[in-house]
């Protein structure tokens, strides 16, 4: 029976991936693979194990197969492909793989790796690794691109890409450049500086304590011994945000919605967590939030179709996509063109994670298109006022369309074209074009 061959594209991808696994760039810092190689008498590792790694399963279309479940003909096809590499060694039976040369001392390798690696930022949370690699390939060969997760939330990209070049000289040459990616001027620094800053961020996050009455204090737990002080609303779910231009030369205002749109970046490999639509009811909670009138809903849908790809216009959907990484976003109180708004999470822990991530960010907030969202907690009397207004509005609206409210002219009773505090808790001013 003939052994099936990999397609040319799959063979190239598999070869590159396995070479990376055993490279000077990865092996010294890959604890699992390094331990497996060290424990092997001949320095070779089961090829079935390598094929069971998540990326390899994807390339080979193996689904959730484990090492013992990898088809033998697939292993043989991969072995034939890897035999063409000068960096890899394949056992005679084609079932094991390893480096063709010995690994240098770990300390020396890490020092060399750091010297030829550049830390570049800021990148959007949904940027693709392939796009970053393609961008830097314009300035020299790229060995690898790493995208470390955020200190405050492991599911979120930190915004810093670690780009490794073949030599220290190559890295130094790149850091002398003035580079702009997707409209953002990049800050370039040695990886050692990034490592030092990250260590400080980890300590800062470990010592981070939210303000009293904030995210991790549910339902008045700070007064748990005195029921008279316990509020009758959930605490720590609301945060406010202010949008500021992320580019140094920009203003704090959003551009007019009449400006032409820019081509957006491709979707990330990991899409933002699904979040409920802003116009859905929240069972057992304030329903006025989800009861936007038809005109407001049409306006938002029209804006989404027109400005989805415009990096200079922030929509509610953009905010839900960014903050949905931290938890379920129940409602976004924001109108296109405004500088400020409010977010309500389903759980206080999500609010806490979002604020912690913003505190640790070099920009002082979280990137939303071409803007930085600077976060503040809504606590104390401000939080009480928010819930009081929502609930009073809910009672008023239940006289309308079957509990979803009559024609109110927008969120929280805001009349169209009005941002006055008398009708809407969000007192933000509209930004003139």
From Swiss-Prot:
Q: Where is the composition biased (Basic residues)?
A: 404-415
> What PROSITE patterns does the record point to?
HTH_LA (PS50961), RRM (PS50102), XRRM (PS51939)
Where does the xRRM domain lie?
298-419
Q: Where is the composition biased (Basic and acidic residues)?
A: 255-283, 299-310
Signal sequence span is none
Query: According to the record, what happens upon gene knockout?
Result: Embryonic-lethal with deficient embryos arrested at early globular stage of development characterized by nucleolar hypertrophy.
Q: Where is the composition biased (Polar residues)?
A: 208-219
Domain of life of the organism in this record? Answer: Eukaryota
- Subcellular locations according to the entry: Nucleus, Nucleoplasm; Nucleus, Nucleolus
Which residues does the UniProt record annotate as the domain RRM?
Answer: 116-193
Q: What is its main location?
A: nucleus
Xref: CDD domains: LA_like_plant, RRM1_La
Q: Name one GO cellular component term.
A: ribonucleoprotein complex
Q: Which InterPro entries match?
A: La_dom_prot (IPR045180), La_HTH (IPR006630), La_xRRM (IPR014886), Lupus_La (IPR002344), Nucleotide-bd_a/b_plait_sf (IPR012677), RBD_domain_sf (IPR035979), RRM_dom (IPR000504), WH-like_DNA-bd_sf (IPR036388)
Region Disordered: what ranges?
Answer: 206-233, 245-310, 395-433
- Every HTH La-type RNA-binding domain range: 4-108
**Which GO MF terms are attached to this record?**
mRNA binding; RNA binding
Tissue specificity: Expressed ubiquitously (at protein level).
List UniProt keywords, sorted A-Z.
Nucleus, RNA-binding
Q: Which GO terms describe its biological process?
A: embryo development ending in seed dormancy; ribosome biogenesis; rRNA processing; sno(s)RNA 3'-end processing; tRNA 3'-end processing
According to its UniProt entry, what is the function of this protein?
A: Binds to the 3' poly(U) terminus of nascent RNA polymerase III transcripts, protecting them from exonuclease digestion and facilitating their folding and maturation.
Which named protein is this?
La protein 1
Q: Which organism is it from?
A: Arabidopsis thaliana (Mouse-ear cress)
Q: What is the lineage of its organism?
A: Eukaryota, Viridiplantae, Streptophyta, Embryophyta, Tracheophyta
